Regions:
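Bacterial signal peptide processing site
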Residues: 22-25
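Short, well-ordered beta-to-alpha junction loops that form the rim of enzyme active sites
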Residues: 130, 184-186, 234-237, 281
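Substrate-binding and catalytic surfaces of secreted/luminal carbohydrate-active proteins
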Residues: 36-74, 181-183, 213-221, 225-230, ...
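N-terminal catalytic cores of secreted or lumenal carbohydrate-active enzymes
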Residues: 53-229, 261
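Residues that line or immediately flank small-molecule/substrate-binding pockets and catalytic motifs
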Residues: 90, 129, 236, 308-309, ...
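Short acidic/His/Gly/Ser-rich catalytic and metal-binding motifs that mark active-site loops
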Residues: 134-138, 189-196, 238-243, 285-288, ...
Length: 483
């Protein structure tokens, strides 16, 4: 159809007026500018992957409480824990792939992961002390020939970490200086253990002092390399002894003695500021960290409890916090993998249990397992042969795939900045799960909502005498942000 100049002018005028409204520069009938219409920004990921952290149309913020059958109340006047952030683990496997397989895109990928606007802003990372199941070989920082010991740690060295792990961490810190690192050993040197090996066993009591010194030297060694350690856990998964990769059992009495009589006092005498976290294992055995906290000497030095996702329910974080509210909570490991191939189920789990559930359960930081793995779920020594990283880096081509864990983290990490506080919000409303935060730097509010219902759900968000109306597809997650 042929358009006349008048029709073209009307189209341009109408488009301009619509654009002005969209940009909150509304025109009053008298020709003057009205008060800008406040809006909330929205980003969505859907269960069918048609939208992946996709920016959605802005949502008008209305005065008063909009009527809706389902209402999420957000109360910024009630605040809980201060957040340090979200992230994953810089394992040997992750560091190797970042350092050797990304090629020219390395810096861009690191900026995407650790930078802000528009990066993910990852700010909480876990670092294995020595080898884990995701290393290329077994090692500790003080290995000795069979039958020999080194109680003074004369041969202690972090040289194993210089080729990959330390450079990768320094690069991340250069991008995000607020990055906090929690370090965990999978095994202490074999000569300290009952098996004489990195595999299985527990600590020999005569080397408890060497155990504490091992931690001190690690923290000071990393600091000298420009990589400060925010916190340590005594042992990864201390109730489990793997058979084909480094591991060690540390029962509650041993952990209580190590913390209360060795690691805690040594850190105090030498001025080490790193926090000491207990447990670093699953939700199914809260009696273990509670037994350590029941020891009055150990309790003086325990700053918090770290949790994993592989058994039990996230609700125990809340119950343990209720018994010891002065002790902080951190979530330090959960991996996806080939055993759970359905994207929608994974999105629901990672957002519902970790991003929402764990932070509602007092977690100040939430870290998933490997930041990066290759297309074969490696490199790895043993244990999980089909784990999935937050990103996959193809070991041949260097092509990066952003997995469901990437988007689950991004819905929080990109918007909830270090220093934010978890604030009150209602949840479990008509299949909707939610958690809310208030950023400290600009006062912006962030609400993350997951729809676990089988159909689209319409709801209202009420806050401070204002409200938002929104409709969320089945299985989708949305992050809403407003001033």
């Amino acid at each position: 159809m042929k358009r006349s100049p008048l029709r073209e002018s009307l189209i341009v005028l109408c488009a301009g007026l619509l654009g002005a409204c969209a940009n909150d520069n509304a025109i009053s009938p008298g020709g003057g500018a009205t008060t800008p219409v406040p809006v909330a920004q929205a980003w969505m990921t859907t269960a069918d992957q048609s939208r992946l952290l996709s920016r959605q149309p802005d949502v008008p913020i209305r005065s008063g409480a909009e009527a809706s059958a389902l209402v999420i109340e957000v109360d910024e006047g009630t605040s809980y824990q201060e957040m340090i952030g979200f992230g994953a683990a810089m394992t040997d496997a992750s560091a190797y792939l970042i350092q050797h397989k990304l090629g020219a895109q390395r810096d861009a990928i690191l900026r995407e992961l650790f930078g802000r606007d528009p990066g993910l802003g990852l700010s909480f990372m876990r670092v294995p002390m020595g080898a884990s199941d995701f290393s290329t070989h077994d090692y500790s920082y003080d290995d000795m020939p069979a039958g020999q010991t080194d109680p003074t740690l004369a041969r202690f060295s972090i040289d194993e970490d210089r080729p990959d792990k330390l450079p990768a961490l320094r690069s991340a810190l250069a991008i995000n200086p607020k990055l906090k690192l929690v370090a965990s050993p999978w095994s202490l040197p074999g000569w300290m253990k009952t098996t004489g090996s990195l595999i299985k066993g527990t600590m020999r009591p005569e080397f408890y002092g060497s155990f504490a010194e091992y931690f001190r030297r690690f923290v000071e060694g990393y600091k000298a390399e420009g990589v400060p350690i925010f916190a340590v856990t005594l042992q990864n998964e201390p109730a489990y002894e793997p058979t084909n990769y480094p591991g060690m059992r540390l029962d509650p009495p041993a952990r209580a003695e190590l913390i209360g009589k060795h690691v805690g006092p040594l850190f105090g005498r030498t001025g080490i500021q790193a926090l000491i976290l207990d447990w670093d294992h699953n939700w199914d055995l809260p009696s273990s960290p509670l037994a350590v906290l029941a020891d009055s000497t150990a309790r003086r030095y325990v700053n918090g409890i770290a949790w994993h996702c592989y058994a039990g329910d996230v609700g125990v974080q809340d119950s343990v916090h209720a018994e010891y509210p002065a002790k902080d909570t951190y979530f330090t490991e959960c991996s996806g993998g080939g055993w759970a191939p359905v994207y929608a189920d994974n999105l629901k789990f990672f957002v519902g249990k970790l991003i929402i559930g764990s932070t509602r359960g007092w977690a100040k930081g939430v870290a998933l397992w490997n930041l990066a793995l290759d297309e074969n779920g490696g490199p790895h020594l043993g244990g999980c042969g089909n784990c999935r990283g937050v990103i996959t880096i193809n070991s041949v081509t260097g092509v990066v795939t952003r997995n469901v864990e990437y988007y689950a983290l991004a819905h929080a990490s990109q918007f909830v900045r270090p220093g934010a506080h978890h604030i009150a919000s209602t949840t479990d409303v008509g299949g909707l799960q939610s958690v809310a935060f208030k950023n400290a730097d600009d006062g912006s509010k962030v609400l993350i909502v997951l729809n676990t219902a089988p159909a689209e759900v319409s709801f209202a968000v009420h806050f401070g005498g204002r409200s938002i109306l929104y409709a969320l597809p089945a299985g989708a997650v949305v992050t809403l942000r407003w001033s």
